[in-house]
Amino acid sequence: MLKSSKKEDSSKKNQNNKLIFTVRKLFSPIKNFFRKTKTPDNFFGVIKRLKINSQKMTLDERNILANLLELEDKTIEDIMVPRSDIAAIKLTTNLEELSESIKLEVPHTRTLIYDGTLDNVVGFIHIKDLFKALATKQNGRLKKLIRKHIIAAPSMKLLDLLAKMRRERTHIAIVVDEYGGTDGLVTIEDLIEEIVGRIDDEHDQQLDSDNFKVINNSTIISNARVEVEVLEEIIGEKLKNDDDEFDTIGGLVLTRVGSVPAIGTRIDISENIEIEVTDATPRSLKQVKIRLKNGLNSK
């Protein structure tokens, strides 16, 4: 996902150094294997053999190998940030206007730029380019700061996307649907986290602490993208059937209502559960309040 850029540069450098050391250590036996043998072998076959003979590996190294194996079958659709969660800026935005807006909130490291609508993404800007332009008192529009992105389909394999990003020398891919509209985005950080696991920074930790809060015995505040299984585990009640196509609490609400309900709408999910919409846009749910009529101890 798009990351916060302040106060975390040094910690990310340390994480990157550890990542490089671990990856080098892991891939050393793979390199040696291909040097010693002339027999054609599948890359993932080698990794599977390494995983089997991994007694000398640490838990982190084993986890990375396991993630690499899973990566073989994963597609962009599995990890992309959905359109409703994309933060973007209009191409016509003035640099001075943007500088005023970022004083009020933590800026992203990279932000998409669109012309007209989000279906026409023209590229992205890096926050360091913006700060440099502001420091040198460059006036005008964002156009001269725009960097290129790549286009990808939801069905594209993650390894293919990683290779394409490397060839094109860019860190952002816009995911488009069959009609050419913007469906989501994937960043290089998303791909790295699929291999090494989630890399938290201070901003992520703050977001996580607000994602799912048990306020008291009868009230829970939740991000709409939290998995239904999390709520089921807390309350001890089954909310999703095997044939249901949703995975999140927001999906549960949308399935019951049939559309995006307005803020303040209350939906009876079961005899014990009522969900109130506390934050939403015309296209998606953001946050809900879950009321347990019989309390958490009812299970």
From Swiss-Prot:
Matching CDD domains = CBS_pair_CorC_HlyC_assoc
User: MF terms per GO, please?
Assistant: flavin adenine dinucleotide binding; toxin activity
* Pfam families the UniProt entry points to: CBS, CorC_HlyC
Protein origin, superkingdom? Bacteria
Q: Which UniProt keywords apply?
A: CBS domain, Cytolysis, Hemolysis, Repeat, Toxin, Virulence
Q: What are the GO BP annotations of this UniProt entry?
A: killing of cells of another organism
Which residues are in the CBS domain?
80-142, 145-202
Question: Which InterPro entries does the UniProt record give?
Answer: CBS_dom (IPR000644), CBS_dom_sf (IPR046342), FAD-bd_PCMH-like_sf (IPR036318), FAD-bd_PCMH_sub2 (IPR016169), Ion_transp-like_CBS (IPR044751), Transptr-assoc_dom (IPR005170)
Q: Cellular component per GO? A: plasma membrane
Has keyword Methyltransferase? no
Family per record: Belongs to the UPF0053 family. Hemolysin C subfamily.
- What name appears for this protein in its UniProt entry? Hemolysin C
Give the organism the record lists: Rickettsia felis (strain ATCC VR-1525 / URRWXCal2) (Rickettsia azadi)
